[in-house]
Each structure stands twice: as C-alpha cells, then as structure tokens.
Amino acid sequence: MMQKLEVSERKACSVLGLNRTTKRYKSKKSDDEAVLREAIVRLASKYGRYGYRRIAAMLKSEGWKVNHKRVERIWREEGLRVPKKQKKRGRIYLRNGSCIRLKPLYQNHVWSYDCVEDKLANGRKIKCLTVIYEFTRESLAIRVERTINSKHVLDTISKLFLTRGIPEYIRSDNGSEFTEKMLRKFIEDVGAKTAYITPGSPWENGFIERFNGTLRDELLNREVFYSLEEARALIENFRREYNSVRPHSSLGYTTPLSYFLF
C-alpha cells in the first residue's frame, strides 16, 4: 500500500488505524520449530504412552534446549494425547508384618519380585517373573515361561546375585513360588532377608506393582505374541528400553541406568 500510494509508513498506519510497532512485528518463533515438531511427533509415535513431560526429558537427553511448556504447546497443536493430571499420592511403605516399614534408602537395600500373566495369540497363558531394584527402579530381570515356580525364581535370583550382589531384603507377596521352603532357605543362607507383604495387600509392594502396571500398559496390552520365543524377545527389548531410554519422573526424569551419573 505504501509503495502504491507513495505515502510514508506513519501516514499509512494513521489512515488504517494501526500501531507502527504492530506493523513491524515479526514472529519470533525459533528457526528450529519445524525440526523440533518433527522430533516430538517421532518420539510420541514410538512411545505412545509417554506424556509431554517425559518426551521433553528425552529431547533434552538428545541435546535439545527446550522446556516442557514449549513441548506441551506443540504437543497440543499436533493433536497428541496429553495425559490427565493425577492427584499426588503419598507413597505407601510397609507398616506391619515381616516387611515392617521398609523404604529403599541405598544401593542393594531392597529388591522386589512378582509375577504377571498374559496370553499368546493362541490363547495359551504365559507368566513373567519380574525383578526390580527398588532404589533406582531398574528392571533387573523379566523371565518369561509357561508357568513360574520356585525353581525358576531361585535360578533367576541366584544368577543376579552373582552379577549384581546380594540385597539386604527381597520384598514379595505370599505366592507359593516365593514362599517355598527351599527358596527361603537359600535367601537366608546367602545373607539376605525375605520381606513378605500382608496377604491381600498388593499396594504394600508398590514399586513392583507400579513396574508391572507399566509393563502391561506400555507393552502387554499393545502387542500380540505368536510364540513364547517372540514374547521373550519383545519383553526383553522393553526391559532394556525401560532401563536406558524411558525417563522416570520419580528419578527427576532420568533413566535408572543413568541415575547415579547425576
């Protein structure tokens, strides 16, 4: 308009009722916006159950200088799912019985184990023995079998003792695979202690229950396993990513394997 009518910027803005500052404003969006947007969509597509805060933490680990608010804005613009906010809950620790009030305070203080069931495509059941290191939330092992008994538990933890040391306590429910006399004697003989939760109180084993929920939510409910071997391979891949890739909010959005580096 200014060139066509040969008028000054001041005159043109006065006629149109515009502020000169507004006229001169240019978007200050970063030049990396498109690349960042692509990265967010890529991570959200790969890790479909992660929220924008966890994606923001992963971007930072990739070298991006970005805060969660910017990631949230792009997340919403792309129509990605933003998890609903949940009320904060106090962490539940054991208050009675053989487990007493047991809180993981340092390395190799408390491990916990439990079992998770699933099915193959043909309907046959499989069972996963999950073992975690409570202090860092690291998944130490996930053993996948048709069924799990005390011999499987003994074999799994004895191998872990050789590579990871012996914990002071191993927390579990009162399932027969964990209470068999041979297993309890072995744990006692190596210098560890069993810590059994109150029967019918899975919330007392909160660390492993939380892990099992994540395993089911992010893998078991999303995959169809056509064989035991395929289930083992995919579940082991999940375990490795859980330890080395997936940021944990309880660890300040670091991963279990990098926790001691910070």
Could you describe each region identified by the protein language model?
Residues M1-E9:
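Charged, often Cys/His-bearing segments associated with DNA-binding zinc-finger transcription factors
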Residues K85-K87, I170-N174, E188-F207, E223-L228:
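RNase H-like polynucleotidyl transferase catalytic core
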Residues R10-V15, I55:
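Short alpha-helical "recognition helix" segments of helix-turn-helix
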